[in-house]
């Protein structure tokens, strides 16, 4: 299967080590994966800010770059949801009569979803990852409710958590139980710009829950959430390292 790794803008600019870790994990697991040249933003920031035409042009480029691939593995639940929901409709709105947008949307998956659903937890465990720490797990809202990475607390169904299942394969890692496990971090992309006071309050509440349960590190599926929480934690001098799931699985988690 011909696969591509999509690296979100903020990961590319601020956390390239996370992209390298994800690529390392995929290659060790035998996934044939490219990081295409010419890859662009998924278009979500423009769309969320109300600049529809700019967002459409960006997602059209995304579709053109990734159309040849059978699987597009995205290092962000937020970006993955945007592509899955809007790639098809944007291309159709632009007058395209082919189904490239719909195909790209269908083939797009988030990194942890891909590992859990298509590679398999047993195979991931063969990586032999190890990290001694008490960790709090934060799943971004888009990944939780948009992609089904875990059961949201408001849904009365049998519990499941794909991210914890993957992290259970990391030797020495103890996952702590939070009082409000699926609480939003408060970032929300442009929400943090438009409503900074609310965003900060939500982030501090999230950190309070994490630290009160003795977590030594925070692990997440989304670096955008961790960027927000890390900024708040540094300002309050909490000494709380934060890592993407890929860094733990690759064995490259180091304090930043």
Model-derived regions, located:
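Iron-sulfur cluster-binding electron-transfer modules in prokaryotic oxidoreductases
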Residues: 1-256
